Design a protein with these regions (language model features):
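Conserved PLP-enzyme active-site core in the AAT-like
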Residues: 1-213, 217
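Conserved C-terminal alpha-helix-loop-beta "cap" of PLP-dependent enzymes
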Residues: 203-353
Length: 353
Protein backbone atom coordinates (compact mmCIF):
# COMPACT_ATOMS: atom_id res chain seq x y z
CA UNK A 1 0.00 0.00 0.00
CA UNK A 2 2.72 2.47 0.95
CA UNK A 3 4.73 1.44 -2.11
CA UNK A 4 1.84 2.15 -4.49
CA UNK A 5 1.18 5.54 -2.87
CA UNK A 6 4.89 6.45 -3.00
CA UNK A 7 5.14 5.47 -6.69
CA UNK A 8 2.20 7.70 -7.55
CA UNK A 9 3.38 10.70 -5.53
CA UNK A 10 6.88 10.42 -6.99
CA UNK A 11 5.61 10.43 -10.58
CA UNK A 12 2.63 12.77 -10.77
CA UNK A 13 2.25 16.31 -9.44
CA UNK A 14 -0.98 17.87 -8.10
CA UNK A 15 -3.70 18.27 -10.77
CA UNK A 16 -1.73 16.22 -13.29
CA UNK A 17 -3.18 13.05 -14.82
CA UNK A 18 -2.49 9.42 -13.95
CA UNK A 19 -3.78 6.64 -16.21
CA UNK A 20 -4.77 3.55 -14.23
CA UNK A 21 -6.92 0.45 -14.50
CA UNK A 22 -10.36 0.68 -12.93
CA UNK A 23 -9.61 -2.57 -11.10
CA UNK A 24 -6.57 -1.09 -9.34
CA UNK A 25 -6.06 -1.71 -5.62
CA UNK A 26 -7.61 0.74 -3.16
CA UNK A 27 -4.12 2.05 -2.31
CA UNK A 28 -4.11 3.72 -5.74
CA UNK A 29 -7.18 5.74 -4.70
CA UNK A 30 -5.30 6.80 -1.57
CA UNK A 31 -2.45 8.00 -3.80
CA UNK A 32 -4.90 10.05 -5.88
CA UNK A 33 -6.35 11.67 -2.76
CA UNK A 34 -3.00 12.46 -1.14
CA UNK A 35 -1.46 13.72 -4.37
CA UNK A 36 -4.43 15.81 -5.60
CA UNK A 37 -4.17 13.84 -8.84
CA UNK A 38 -6.72 13.47 -11.63
CA UNK A 39 -7.41 9.81 -12.45
CA UNK A 40 -7.98 8.59 -16.00
CA UNK A 41 -9.53 5.16 -15.57
CA UNK A 42 -9.34 2.38 -18.16
CA UNK A 43 -11.97 -0.33 -17.88
CA UNK A 44 -10.27 -3.72 -17.70
CA UNK A 45 -11.32 -6.54 -19.96
CA UNK A 46 -13.81 -8.95 -18.43
CA UNK A 47 -14.18 -12.73 -18.65
CA UNK A 48 -17.96 -13.07 -18.50
CA UNK A 49 -17.93 -16.86 -18.10
CA UNK A 50 -15.80 -16.69 -14.95
CA UNK A 51 -17.00 -13.26 -13.82
CA UNK A 52 -13.41 -11.99 -13.47
CA UNK A 53 -11.80 -8.72 -14.54
CA UNK A 54 -8.55 -9.55 -16.31
CA UNK A 55 -6.44 -6.59 -17.45
CA UNK A 56 -5.80 -4.16 -20.28
CA UNK A 57 -4.05 -4.59 -23.62
CA UNK A 58 -1.42 -2.36 -25.27
CA UNK A 59 -4.15 -1.21 -27.67
CA UNK A 60 -6.41 -0.23 -24.75
CA UNK A 61 -3.58 1.85 -23.30
CA UNK A 62 -2.72 3.47 -26.62
CA UNK A 63 -6.33 4.59 -27.16
CA UNK A 64 -6.40 6.12 -23.69
CA UNK A 65 -3.10 7.96 -24.22
CA UNK A 66 -4.38 9.36 -27.52
CA UNK A 67 -7.34 10.87 -25.65
CA UNK A 68 -5.13 12.07 -22.77
CA UNK A 69 -1.77 13.11 -24.28
CA UNK A 70 -1.01 15.24 -21.19
CA UNK A 71 -0.99 12.23 -18.81
CA UNK A 72 2.27 11.90 -16.87
CA UNK A 73 2.30 8.25 -15.79
CA UNK A 74 0.45 4.97 -16.01
CA UNK A 75 -0.20 2.52 -13.17
CA UNK A 76 -0.55 -1.07 -14.39
CA UNK A 77 -1.77 -4.01 -12.32
CA UNK A 78 -0.40 -7.40 -13.36
CA UNK A 79 -1.04 -10.14 -12.48
CA UNK A 80 -4.53 -9.91 -11.02
CA UNK A 81 -5.49 -11.85 -7.89
CA UNK A 82 -6.29 -14.93 -10.01
CA UNK A 83 -2.81 -15.06 -11.61
CA UNK A 84 -3.86 -13.64 -14.99
CA UNK A 85 -1.06 -11.50 -16.44
CA UNK A 86 -1.23 -8.79 -19.09
CA UNK A 87 1.19 -8.13 -21.96
CA UNK A 88 3.42 -6.03 -19.72
CA UNK A 89 6.23 -5.84 -22.26
CA UNK A 90 3.86 -4.40 -24.87
CA UNK A 91 2.23 -2.04 -22.37
CA UNK A 92 5.61 -0.72 -21.20
CA UNK A 93 6.70 -0.10 -24.80
CA UNK A 94 3.50 1.87 -25.55
CA UNK A 95 3.95 3.97 -22.42
CA UNK A 96 7.65 4.61 -23.17
CA UNK A 97 6.86 5.65 -26.74
CA UNK A 98 4.70 8.41 -25.26
CA UNK A 99 7.13 9.34 -22.48
CA UNK A 100 4.94 8.14 -19.61
CA UNK A 101 6.48 6.92 -16.37
CA UNK A 102 5.53 3.25 -15.93
CA UNK A 103 4.41 2.10 -12.48
CA UNK A 104 3.47 -1.54 -11.88
CA UNK A 105 1.55 -3.04 -9.00
CA UNK A 106 2.96 -6.57 -9.08
CA UNK A 107 1.68 -7.47 -5.62
CA UNK A 108 0.94 -11.06 -6.65
CA UNK A 109 4.01 -11.60 -8.84
CA UNK A 110 7.03 -11.41 -6.56
CA UNK A 111 7.86 -15.05 -7.37
CA UNK A 112 7.82 -14.59 -11.17
CA UNK A 113 11.53 -13.79 -11.43
CA UNK A 114 12.53 -17.17 -10.03
CA UNK A 115 11.01 -19.57 -12.57
CA UNK A 116 10.83 -19.53 -16.39
CA UNK A 117 7.40 -21.22 -16.37
CA UNK A 118 5.84 -18.14 -14.77
CA UNK A 119 5.00 -14.82 -16.46
CA UNK A 120 7.81 -12.28 -16.92
CA UNK A 121 8.30 -10.00 -13.93
CA UNK A 122 7.85 -6.25 -14.39
CA UNK A 123 11.25 -5.87 -12.72
CA UNK A 124 12.93 -7.92 -15.45
CA UNK A 125 10.99 -5.95 -18.07
CA UNK A 126 12.50 -2.74 -16.64
CA UNK A 127 9.37 -0.85 -15.62
CA UNK A 128 10.27 2.42 -13.89
CA UNK A 129 8.90 1.41 -10.49
CA UNK A 130 7.46 -1.91 -9.33
CA UNK A 131 5.91 -2.75 -5.98
CA UNK A 132 5.62 -6.38 -4.83
CA UNK A 133 3.93 -7.85 -1.76
CA UNK A 134 6.37 -10.52 -0.66
CA UNK A 135 3.97 -11.91 1.93
CA UNK A 136 1.27 -12.71 -0.64
CA UNK A 137 3.03 -15.58 -2.41
CA UNK A 138 6.27 -16.19 -0.48
CA UNK A 139 6.89 -17.30 3.13
CA UNK A 140 7.50 -13.95 4.82
CA UNK A 141 5.68 -11.96 7.50
CA UNK A 142 2.45 -10.16 6.61
CA UNK A 143 3.14 -6.47 5.74
CA UNK A 144 6.46 -7.27 4.06
CA UNK A 145 6.72 -5.66 0.63
CA UNK A 146 9.44 -4.28 -1.61
CA UNK A 147 9.63 -1.33 -4.01
CA UNK A 148 11.97 -1.66 -7.00
CA UNK A 149 13.35 1.40 -8.81
CA UNK A 150 14.82 1.79 -12.26
CA UNK A 151 17.39 4.34 -11.14
CA UNK A 152 18.01 5.53 -14.70
CA UNK A 153 14.67 7.35 -14.49
CA UNK A 154 13.65 7.61 -10.82
CA UNK A 155 15.33 9.73 -8.16
CA UNK A 156 16.04 7.41 -5.26
CA UNK A 157 16.28 10.33 -2.84
CA UNK A 158 12.72 11.47 -3.62
CA UNK A 159 11.36 7.98 -2.99
CA UNK A 160 13.28 7.75 0.28
CA UNK A 161 11.79 11.06 1.40
CA UNK A 162 8.26 9.99 0.49
CA UNK A 163 8.64 6.68 2.31
CA UNK A 164 9.87 8.53 5.38
CA UNK A 165 6.70 10.64 5.26
CA UNK A 166 4.34 7.72 4.65
CA UNK A 167 5.50 4.89 6.86
CA UNK A 168 6.66 4.35 10.41
CA UNK A 169 9.92 5.89 11.58
CA UNK A 170 10.46 2.75 13.71
CA UNK A 171 10.46 -0.13 11.21
CA UNK A 172 10.36 -3.69 12.49
CA UNK A 173 13.71 -5.46 12.27
CA UNK A 174 11.79 -8.75 12.32
CA UNK A 175 10.02 -7.70 9.13
CA UNK A 176 13.27 -6.63 7.48
CA UNK A 177 14.99 -9.88 8.46
CA UNK A 178 11.99 -11.77 7.08
CA UNK A 179 12.41 -10.01 3.72
CA UNK A 180 16.12 -10.78 3.57
CA UNK A 181 15.62 -14.40 4.64
CA UNK A 182 13.04 -15.10 1.94
CA UNK A 183 15.19 -13.27 -0.65
CA UNK A 184 18.08 -15.60 0.14
CA UNK A 185 15.78 -18.64 0.24
CA UNK A 186 14.39 -17.90 -3.22
CA UNK A 187 17.76 -16.96 -4.72
CA UNK A 188 19.10 -20.39 -3.74
CA UNK A 189 16.03 -22.64 -4.07
CA UNK A 190 13.43 -20.55 -5.91
CA UNK A 191 13.23 -22.51 -9.16
CA UNK A 192 13.11 -25.83 -7.35
CA UNK A 193 10.37 -24.61 -4.98
CA UNK A 194 8.20 -23.20 -7.75
CA UNK A 195 8.69 -26.30 -9.93
CA UNK A 196 7.18 -28.26 -7.04
CA UNK A 197 4.33 -25.76 -6.61
CA UNK A 198 3.46 -26.04 -10.31
CA UNK A 199 3.55 -29.84 -10.08
CA UNK A 200 1.11 -29.75 -7.15
CA UNK A 201 -1.15 -27.27 -8.97
CA UNK A 202 -1.20 -29.50 -12.06
CA UNK A 203 -2.07 -32.48 -9.87
CA UNK A 204 -4.96 -30.47 -8.43
CA UNK A 205 -6.29 -29.59 -11.89
CA UNK A 206 -6.03 -33.21 -13.00
CA UNK A 207 -8.05 -34.32 -9.96
CA UNK A 208 -10.67 -31.59 -10.48
CA UNK A 209 -10.99 -32.60 -14.15
CA UNK A 210 -12.57 -35.84 -12.93
CA UNK A 211 -15.58 -33.94 -11.60
CA UNK A 212 -18.71 -33.38 -13.68
CA UNK A 213 -19.70 -29.90 -12.46
CA UNK A 214 -16.71 -28.48 -10.56
CA UNK A 215 -14.19 -26.98 -12.99
CA UNK A 216 -10.71 -25.40 -12.97
CA UNK A 217 -9.17 -23.63 -15.95
CA UNK A 218 -5.57 -23.95 -17.08
CA UNK A 219 -3.26 -21.78 -19.20
CA UNK A 220 -4.63 -22.88 -22.55
CA UNK A 221 -8.19 -22.03 -21.54
CA UNK A 222 -7.56 -18.32 -20.94
CA UNK A 223 -4.39 -17.08 -22.68
CA UNK A 224 -5.22 -14.91 -25.67
CA UNK A 225 -8.72 -14.14 -24.39
CA UNK A 226 -10.05 -11.02 -22.64
CA UNK A 227 -6.64 -9.36 -22.40
CA UNK A 228 -4.90 -12.33 -20.74
CA UNK A 229 -1.34 -12.69 -22.05
CA UNK A 230 0.12 -15.17 -19.56
CA UNK A 231 -0.89 -17.08 -16.44
CA UNK A 232 0.53 -18.12 -13.07
CA UNK A 233 -0.43 -21.80 -12.62
CA UNK A 234 0.17 -21.67 -8.85
CA UNK A 235 -3.13 -19.77 -8.56
CA UNK A 236 -5.86 -22.41 -8.54
CA UNK A 237 -9.25 -20.97 -9.48
CA UNK A 238 -12.09 -23.46 -9.00
CA UNK A 239 -15.36 -22.60 -10.72
CA UNK A 240 -18.38 -23.72 -8.70
CA UNK A 241 -21.33 -22.15 -10.55
CA UNK A 242 -21.95 -25.19 -12.78
CA UNK A 243 -22.71 -27.21 -9.64
CA UNK A 244 -25.25 -24.55 -8.63
CA UNK A 245 -23.18 -23.01 -5.83
CA UNK A 246 -21.76 -19.53 -5.53
CA UNK A 247 -18.14 -19.31 -4.48
CA UNK A 248 -19.31 -17.65 -1.26
CA UNK A 249 -21.44 -20.70 -0.37
CA UNK A 250 -18.59 -23.10 -1.12
CA UNK A 251 -16.14 -21.11 0.99
CA UNK A 252 -18.53 -21.15 3.94
CA UNK A 253 -19.25 -24.89 3.68
CA UNK A 254 -15.57 -25.79 3.18
CA UNK A 255 -14.76 -23.87 6.33
CA UNK A 256 -17.58 -25.12 8.57
CA UNK A 257 -17.96 -28.69 7.31
CA UNK A 258 -14.45 -29.62 6.17
CA UNK A 259 -12.16 -27.27 8.15
CA UNK A 260 -10.63 -25.89 4.93
CA UNK A 261 -9.74 -22.22 4.60
CA UNK A 262 -9.40 -20.83 1.08
CA UNK A 263 -7.92 -17.53 -0.14
CA UNK A 264 -10.91 -15.86 -1.78
CA UNK A 265 -14.42 -16.46 -3.07
CA UNK A 266 -16.61 -14.63 -5.56
CA UNK A 267 -19.97 -15.21 -7.20
CA UNK A 268 -18.73 -17.99 -9.49
CA UNK A 269 -15.42 -19.26 -8.08
CA UNK A 270 -13.16 -19.98 -5.17
CA UNK A 271 -9.43 -19.27 -5.30
CA UNK A 272 -6.67 -21.32 -3.68
CA UNK A 273 -2.95 -20.52 -3.57
CA UNK A 274 -0.35 -23.24 -4.05
CA UNK A 275 2.69 -22.15 -2.05
CA UNK A 276 5.95 -23.51 -0.65
CA UNK A 277 3.92 -24.91 2.25
CA UNK A 278 1.42 -26.82 0.09
CA UNK A 279 1.41 -30.58 -0.40
CA UNK A 280 -0.40 -33.21 -2.46
CA UNK A 281 -2.12 -34.25 0.79
CA UNK A 282 -3.66 -30.77 0.97
CA UNK A 283 -4.98 -31.23 -2.56
CA UNK A 284 -6.41 -34.65 -1.76
CA UNK A 285 -8.25 -33.18 1.22
CA UNK A 286 -9.55 -30.31 -0.91
CA UNK A 287 -10.73 -32.47 -3.81
CA UNK A 288 -12.34 -34.92 -1.39
CA UNK A 289 -14.34 -32.02 0.04
CA UNK A 290 -15.24 -30.75 -3.44
CA UNK A 291 -16.84 -34.13 -4.15
CA UNK A 292 -19.66 -33.02 -1.84
CA UNK A 293 -20.61 -30.17 -4.20
CA UNK A 294 -20.17 -32.20 -7.39
CA UNK A 295 -22.43 -34.96 -6.09
CA UNK A 296 -25.02 -32.56 -4.66
CA UNK A 297 -25.65 -30.33 -7.67
CA UNK A 298 -28.41 -27.79 -7.21
CA UNK A 299 -29.98 -24.91 -9.09
CA UNK A 300 -28.25 -21.68 -8.12
CA UNK A 301 -30.74 -19.46 -6.30
CA UNK A 302 -29.39 -16.17 -7.59
CA UNK A 303 -27.79 -16.89 -10.95
CA UNK A 304 -27.48 -13.74 -13.03
CA UNK A 305 -25.54 -12.13 -15.86
CA UNK A 306 -23.33 -9.18 -14.95
CA UNK A 307 -23.96 -6.14 -17.12
CA UNK A 308 -20.98 -3.84 -16.82
CA UNK A 309 -21.79 -0.13 -16.56
CA UNK A 310 -19.58 2.42 -18.25
CA UNK A 311 -17.11 4.25 -16.04
CA UNK A 312 -19.02 7.37 -14.91
CA UNK A 313 -17.62 10.83 -15.66
CA UNK A 314 -15.38 12.37 -13.00
CA UNK A 315 -17.37 15.15 -11.31
CA UNK A 316 -14.77 16.04 -8.71
CA UNK A 317 -11.14 15.19 -7.94
CA UNK A 318 -10.91 12.49 -5.24
CA UNK A 319 -8.98 14.98 -3.08
CA UNK A 320 -11.88 17.46 -3.15
CA UNK A 321 -14.39 14.72 -2.39
CA UNK A 322 -12.41 13.71 0.66
CA UNK A 323 -12.35 17.31 1.93
CA UNK A 324 -16.16 17.57 1.96
CA UNK A 325 -18.46 16.74 4.87
CA UNK A 326 -20.17 13.45 3.97
CA UNK A 327 -23.88 12.72 4.20
CA UNK A 328 -25.15 9.22 4.92
CA UNK A 329 -28.01 8.23 2.59
CA UNK A 330 -29.74 4.92 1.73
CA UNK A 331 -28.15 3.07 -1.17
CA UNK A 332 -31.51 3.08 -2.97
CA UNK A 333 -31.36 6.90 -3.06
CA UNK A 334 -27.72 7.22 -4.10
CA UNK A 335 -28.03 7.29 -7.91
CA UNK A 336 -26.33 10.43 -9.20
CA UNK A 337 -24.57 11.16 -5.91
CA UNK A 338 -20.78 11.43 -5.51
CA UNK A 339 -19.19 8.77 -3.32
CA UNK A 340 -17.26 10.18 -0.35
CA UNK A 341 -15.18 7.04 0.18
CA UNK A 342 -14.62 3.70 -1.49
CA UNK A 343 -16.79 0.66 -0.89
CA UNK A 344 -14.25 -2.10 -1.12
CA UNK A 345 -14.68 -5.87 -0.67
CA UNK A 346 -11.54 -7.46 0.73
CA UNK A 347 -10.02 -9.59 -0.64
CA UNK A 348 -9.24 -8.51 -3.36
CA UNK A 349 -9.16 -4.87 -2.18
CA UNK A 350 -10.51 -3.43 -5.44
CA UNK A 351 -13.05 -0.63 -4.89
CA UNK A 352 -16.53 -1.58 -6.05
CA UNK A 353 -17.56 2.08 -5.75
Amino acid sequence: TVGVIAMILASVKPKEKLILQRNSHRSAIAGLVLGQIEPIFIQSNFNSELGIFTGITPDDLLKCIMKNPDAKAVLLTSPNYYGMATDLDGLIKVARDHKLTVLVDEAHGVHFHFNPYLPKSAVDLRADMVVQSIHKTLPSFTQTSILHLNEDKIEKERIQTLLAYLQTSSPSYLFMMSIDAVRSYMAIKGKEIIDREIEIANFARAEIKKFKYIKSFNKNDIIGKDGVFDFDPTKLTITTKYAGYSGFEVESILNSKFNIEIELSDMNNILCFITAGSSTEDIKKLTSALTYFDENKKIMDNEFEIELPNIPPLKMLPTLTFSKTPELIPFSESAGAISYDVICPYPPGIPLL
